[in-house]
């Protein structure tokens, strides 16, 4: 970090930044291959319940239009 930036930061901001750096240093790291495999399995498991992929039944949808408006 630039020394001039440290002079402009107050003590509380520096403490927060140190806490954040400690948190990030203690995070469990996964190889990308493991992360991709986990994400893929999650998507495949939850694909059945995703309303954007499998649209819900229109009969049970309270916001779906019931019929067309006829004027006459």
UniProtKB/Swiss-Prot annotation:
* Cysteine methyl ester modification, residue list: 69
Q: Where in the cell is it found?
A: Cell membrane; Cytoplasm; Cell projection, Axon; Cell projection, Rhabdomere
Which GO biological-process labels does this protein carry?
phospholipase C-activating G protein-coupled receptor signaling pathway; sensory perception of taste; visual perception
Please give, as recorded in its UniProt entry, the membrane topology of this protein. Answer: Lipid-anchor
Instruction: Tell me the superkingdom of the source.
Output: Eukaryota
Q: Does this entry carry the keyword Lipoprotein? A: yes
GO cellular component assignments: axon; cytoplasm; heterotrimeric G-protein complex; rhabdomere
Chain's role: Guanine nucleotide-binding proteins (G proteins) are involved as a modulator or transducer in various transmembrane signaling systems. The beta and gamma chains are required for the GTPase activity, for replacement of GDP by GTP, and for G protein-effector interaction. This subunit functions in visual transduction in the compound eye.
Tell me the protein's name: Guanine nucleotide-binding protein subunit gamma-e
């Amino acid at each position: 970090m630039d020394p001039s930036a440290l002079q402009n930061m107050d003590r509380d901001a520096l403490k927060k930044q140190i806490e954040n750096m400690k948190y990030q240093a203690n995070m469990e790291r996964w190889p990308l291959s493991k992360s991709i495999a986990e994400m893929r399995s999650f998507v495949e498991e939850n694909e059945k319940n995703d309303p954007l992929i499998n649209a819900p039944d229109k009969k049970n949808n309270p916001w779906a239009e019931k019929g067309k408006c006829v004027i006459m």
